[in-house]
């Protein structure tokens, strides 16, 4: 493991300019962490976040190390409870194991009911970004503030049928909006074409409100739609099956990132 430079107070920068620490124990000054994280969120580079839901669960450490060594920017982790969506994915022990070995940003997407009950738990597990579903929150603004109070960036996910206009009053409090481009619950689904229009609408809302919110796309992302998603306003592309089912996942990540930033 590379030792952090004293100049960066515990931050190790990857080739993709990831500012998050390899060992969270090195983090002594939260104000520096927050400032660096904010700089990262305002970067113009488009980001790739492999979805661990599509990884080989029987050889998970191998796939985590592959992402660590790749040009990926974030680890995207889908947490499902079998209630909000029909599938069940990761429990806390698995998430703890992932964050222990991951050396990149931990982007957690909660597809669960009553997400407020678990905000502190996910913060303690090392999550950098915590995204909750608009459809699962009874008081969205309060949930966002609770996430930020734990030192995480606050994201809001919306299902394919949810109207962008519902974020009008909270967009300035949201660090990231995740647009589901498939119906949530299972990996490997086909891409919903109306996603392009939703990204355009969301980008227009962000600009009109003067917000700095990132747009993340989750579901069915491949080399066939990545470029157009970026062109209409996306900042972060989540790719699961396209990466992990390929013959060379690391090369697939590299090519996807190059395509997104070309």
Where are these regions (language model features)?
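Conserved N-terminal beta1-alpha1 strand-loop-helix module at the mouth
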Residues: 37-131, 137-139, 154, 167-174, ...
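Short helix-capping segments at alpha-helix termini
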Residues: 71, 101-104, 149-151, 206-212, ...
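Short secondary-structure boundary segments
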Residues: 79, 110, 134, 158-160, ...
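Glycine-rich phosphate-binding active-site loops on the catalytic face of alpha/beta enzymes
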Residues: 136, 181-188, 233-252
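Acidic, divalent-metal-coordinating active-site segment for phosphoryl/phosphodiester hydrolysis
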Residues: 220-232
